[in-house]
């Protein structure tokens, strides 16, 4: 059967389509298709009338490829969404260069012919994984927005009570509390602290901390009072400065509520997955990080082996050899998902902060011990964490695969027992 590759260069509201056969001959010159039901139905009918095996190839360009991919997939057409970087490297073989939508659609169609046997069919994601991916994208956008506002708040602290930020920790998604935000809302200027004696401030601070649900400590109060006493503020303690702070606090409070809402929903969705407890039981992983792990990784079963999962995180280090030269100091590729890599690194940071005697570490010590061993070998802390993350992902992949294999065996055994019971019932009748 003739192989027919359909290259789709996706844009926001329209796509350019080129249809090419296995010999590289253009069957239909590049044409424009708008992302409407009528035009996509026309495209699907056109592709079905072609005499051959049709595969539609498009680049992964954020979210714009999904409407057309979903519509054509529901029509029974093979869809493959490929990494845009792969197509870019493939296009670099063209010495002439140049870039237009028509030229790009030809390049994508040509890529489909060249890598026909390696094309992976895109599957419509299940509801849980889809929801987690959507929530994770929203979480990352809100997190970026929060970082901008947090920098604004830290700038305010540097001008109103310099040095105080060392004693103020930010939002904790486990407790859903933000000590820095609550503190500056109560003690908005250095003068608010030093106008009291240390004993008076300690009493006020401990009462406030207890009311807010923090651990009130006289030692913490003494440190804060000492910083306030010695610092030199640039901002005066006047109504204008207080109004500016209140605006920052309101913005940051809103983003914090958004983040807490998103993470709470992510945890609820992630708990529906059979493999959730496997990740949750690993040391360094709480409910928020476990939910974000699946939000950024998706369905682990789609990877053919653990190496593919490691490569998706972009922490694989390919060989570097030429002639007699063989590199011993290789860097990670960083070609995978940055969000997944960042989430994994956060897990390793949380794991490193734990102790060997803690229950979760004692039950699953492999990754923790491996990280310590790498540090003992003289590896920099970041390198040791990335190496440990590599091991962490391999362990997770093996355990999830084993879980689903056992579930499949149990399902087959159940079906077999059911069929035997039916057969016995018929025989008795």
Residue positions per predicted region:
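A detector of single, family-specific signature residues
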Residues: 1-429
């Amino acid at each position: 059967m003739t192989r027919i590759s359909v290259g789709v260069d996706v844009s926001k509201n329209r796509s350019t389509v080129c249809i090419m056969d296995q010999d590289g001959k253009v069957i239909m010159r590049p044409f424009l298709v708008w992302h409407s039901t009528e035009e996509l139905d026309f495209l699907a009918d056109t592709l079905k009338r072609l005499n051959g095996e049709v595969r539609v190839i498009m680049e992964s360009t954020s979210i714009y490829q999904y409407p057309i991919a979903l519509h054509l997939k529901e029509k029974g057409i093979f869809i493959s969404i490929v990494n845009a970087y792969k197509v870019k490297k493939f296009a670099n073989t063209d010495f002439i260069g140049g870039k237009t939508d028509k030229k790009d659609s030809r390049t994508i169609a040509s890529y489909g012919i060249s890598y026909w046997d390696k094309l992976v069919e895109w599957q419509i994601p299940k509801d849980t994984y889809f929801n987690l991916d959507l929530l994770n994208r929203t979480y990352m956008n809100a997190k970026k927005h929060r970082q901008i506002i947090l920098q604004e708040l830290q700038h305010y602290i540097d001008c109103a009570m310099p040095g105080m930020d060392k004693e103020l920790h930010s939002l904790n998604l486990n407790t859903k509390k933000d000590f820095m935000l609550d503190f500056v809302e109560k003690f908005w200027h250095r003068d608010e602290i030093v106008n009291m004696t240390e004993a008076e401030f300690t009493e006020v601070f401990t009462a406030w901390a207890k009311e807010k649900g923090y651990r009130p400590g006289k030692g913490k109060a003494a440190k804060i009072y000492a910083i306030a006493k010695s610092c030199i503020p640039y901002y005066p303690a006047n109504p204008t400065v207080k109004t500016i702070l209140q605006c920052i606090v309101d913005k940051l409070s809103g983003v914090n509520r958004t983040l807490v809402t998103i993470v709470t929903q992510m945890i609820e969705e992630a708990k529906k997955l059979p493999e959730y407890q496997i990740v949750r039981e690993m040391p360094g992983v709480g409910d928020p990080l476990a939910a974000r792990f699946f939000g950024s990784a998706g369905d682990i079963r789609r990877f053919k082996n653990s190496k593919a999962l490691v490569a998706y995180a972009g922490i694989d280090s390919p060989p570097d050899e030429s002639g007699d030269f063989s590199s011993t100091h290789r860097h990670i590729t960083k070609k995978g998902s940055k969000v997944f890599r960042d989430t994994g690194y956060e897990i390793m940071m949380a794991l490193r902060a734990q102790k060997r005697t803690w229950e979760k570490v004692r039950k699953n010590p492999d990754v923790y011990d491996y990280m310590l061993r790498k540090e003992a070998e003289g590896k920099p802390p970041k390198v040791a964490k990335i190496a440990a993350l590599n091991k962490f992902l391999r362990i997770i992949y093996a355990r999830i695969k084993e879980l689903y294999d056992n579930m499949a065996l149990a399902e087959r055994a159940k079906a077999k027992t059911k069929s035997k019971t039916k057969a016995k019932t018929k025989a008795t009748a």
